[in-house]
Amino acid sequence: MNVLVTGANGFVGTALQGRLQHEGYDVRAITRNEVGNIDSKTEWTPHLENVDTIVHLAGRAHVMRETARDPLAEFRKTNRDGTACLAQCAIASGVRRLVFISSVKVNGEVSANPFNSSSPAMPQDPYAISKFEAEQVLESLRSELEIVIFRPPLVYGPNVRGNFIRLIKLVDRGIPLPLASVTNRRSLVGLTNLADAICWGVRAQPGLYFPSDRQDQSAANLIRKIAESLNRSARLFPMHPRLLAVAGHLAGKREIINRLTGSLTVDGDLPGWSPPESMDAEIKRTVHWYTDSKHASP
C-alpha cells in the first residue's frame, strides 16, 4: 500500500515515516519544499498518483506568541482551506483514505470526564477553530473518501517543543515548582505511541479517535517522572490552587498554569490497539535526547 505523508519532516512526521516503513508500507514523504504554501491553491495532484492513503500532518501549528494580525484567518488558510484542497485533490486522484491529525483542543481546554467521539466540540482559540472546521469539511466528504480523524492530547518525545520542553528545562534547573498539591489528571501520548496509532488508523474503521498512553498523570507526578529521568529531585511545594492561578495571571503565565493545573483526559479507545511503549520509557527517551542536545550545544 502506498501512503503519502504530508509534513513528513516534522516532529510527528519523521517518527511516522519510520513506523510506516517498518510495517511494510511504501511511504511517499511530502514537505513544503515540494508543495510550497499550503492553502486553497496548493498543487497536490502531481504527488497523488497511485497513492492509496494520505496521512495529513502538515499545518499551521499552535504557538504561544502569535504575531499575525489576523490569527484566525491565517490558521484557516492553512489548516481548513489547505485540508479541503488536499481532500478534493485526493478524491479526483482516486485516493481511498485520508487520515487527518487534528487536536484535542477541538474539544476545549479542560474536561470533567474523558473526551470521546461523542463529546461536543468546543474550540476556544484560532488554532482549534481551524482544526475543527477542517474536520467538518472532511466529514462532508465521507461518501467519497474514507476519513479517519485523530485528536491527540499533548504529544511528547525526542525533538519535542512547547510546554513539555519548558517543563523539562525547569526541572533540570532545579527551580521549585508550586504544584505538590495539584491533583489534576492529564492525558498525554508519546511520539512512539502516536506514530503506532496512526499506522493503526491507516487500516482501521473510519471514525474519530483519541489516542493516548492510557496512563493519565497529575502535573506533580509528571514532574517526578521527568526528575527521575534527569537523576534530580523533584522540587515541589504546595500552593493553594486559587493563589497559584492569581500568581500565574500576574506573571503573564496564565495559559501555562491552566495547562498544568487543569484536567484534560481522553478515552484512548482505539479498538484492537494498545500503546506499544510505556510512558516511563518515552519520558526517559525524551530526557536523554534533551541532555544529549544540551551537551552538544556550543
Predicted features along the sequence, with ranges:
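Conserved C-terminal active-site "lid" loop/helix of NAD(P)H-dependent oxidoreductases
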Residues: 191, 220, 224, 246-285
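NAD(P)H-binding glycine-rich loop region in Rossmannoid oxidoreductase-like domains
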Residues: 40-81, 85, 89, 106-109
